[in-house]
Amino acid sequence: MLLASTTSAVPRTLSPPTPAGNGSRELLDTRDPLLVQAELALLSTVFVAVALSNGLVLGALARRVRRGRWAPMHVFIGHLCLADLAVALFQVLPQLAWDATDRFRGPDALCRAVKYLQMVGMYASSYMILAMTLDRHRAICRPMLAYRHGGGARWNRPVLVAWAFSLILSLPQLFIFAQRDVGNGSGVLDCWAHFAEPWGLRAYVTWIALMVFVAPALGIAACQVLIFREIHSSLVPGPAERAGGCRGGHRTGSPSEGARVSAAMAKTVRMTLVIVIVYVLCWAPFFLVQLWAAWDPQAPLEGAPFVLLMLLASLNSCTNPWIYAFFSSSVSSELRSLFCWARSRAPPSLGPQEESCATASSFLAKDTSS
């Protein structure tokens, strides 16, 4: 039998336990105070960053909804923000309280619910990005299918599938984790994972890495490559332009149309690189240390870099809203207007503020479709 210690969000929920002492006082006093302070500071920073950034983007989208300017891409950006807010509220915040008290303070039902919701947030954040990329692929490569399936609905099929998979794939957490005695009759309870076989922990960590990181990353990269090839093929005449790409695109027939497609292609290439690179950079360190801890009995579990990297499961939730807001001119213009509205509520200042707000308003008037 294998018991997994669970004193951080997902990392230690899946990692081998540190040796426990015989008494409850010894169990509670084993942590490095400086490392605990670093953990709390890191989790607090991540929580504020995730909540603030996603809240701002949701506020910008809400302004567009009130004005009747809701576009299909905004559906996915909105649900991605909701998924990332779930990460902040159900993963980072409980983990912050958990690290502050060392042991999980709550009944068994709360332990299972927290571990379940922590995993739901991880899955939903990754799968919403994948759903958004799949929808962009369908809209560009097979536009008729996109219209037929109602891509502009606020609850469309990819969004529902992403949430459904997140809820279903997180169910094992309800059965793996429970309030258990952390020592041999010590009387100290913590929210720990239990695996009947020694290989259970390794199998579970590997499965999570594949389903949360590897599979979505490959899907996102593949869709973005196909989107780029479709846009590129529309600029190249000839029967071979669809070979190896996707179907349903259209060819531009005028120089101005070609210029617009060239600009769209350049934007798509930039967005592809940013999405894939940021996604990999945010998730790779976390899952590398997870797999290392699961497969290597000699892993430095108590080292400060190791412990802090294990807390970065939600790092991608900090970057998601800004990536898509940056590449959506309508959302970025709404954010400018939102900032200007907040500044206009402050005491009057110099003229440049008014000029910047007017500029933001002009951006908003020009772009209402993206």
Swiss-Prot record:
PANTHER family: NEUROPEPTIDE RECEPTOR-RELATED G-PROTEIN COUPLED RECEPTOR, VASOPRESSIN V2 RECEPTOR. Receptor for arginine vasopressin. The activity of this receptor is mediated by G proteins which activate adenylate cyclase. Involved in renal water reabsorption. It is found in: Cell membrane. Pfam families: 7tm_1 (PF00001). Glycans are attached at residue 22. Disulfide bonds: none annotated. Interacts with ARRDC4. Identified in a complex containing at least ARRDC4, V2R and HGS. Interacts with TMEM147. Belongs to the G-protein coupled receptor 1 family. Vasopressin/oxytocin receptor subfamily. The keyword Hydrolase does not apply. Residues 1-10 have a biased composition (Polar residues). It is a multi-pass membrane protein. Keywords: Cell membrane, G-protein coupled receptor, Glycoprotein, Lipoprotein, Membrane, Palmitate, Receptor, Transducer, Transmembrane, Transmembrane helix. Residues 1-26 are annotated as: Disordered. One of its GO terms (cellular component) is plasma membrane. GO terms for biological process: cellular response to hormone stimulus; G protein-coupled receptor signaling pathway; positive regulation of gene expression; positive regulation of vasoconstriction; regulation of systemic arterial blood pressure by vasopressin. This is Vasopressin V2 receptor. GO terms for molecular function: vasopressin receptor activity. Its main location: membrane. Residues 63-76, 135-158, 220-270, 328-370 are cytoplasmic. Residues 1-37, 98-112, 180-199, 293-307 are extracellular. The gene is AVPR2. InterPro entries: GPCR_Rhodpsn, GPCR_Rhodpsn_7TM, Vasoprsn_rcpt, Vprsn_rcpt_V2. A lipid is attached at residue 340 (S-palmitoyl cysteine). SUPFAM superfamilies: Family A G protein-coupled receptor-like (SSF81321). It comes from Canis lupus familiaris.
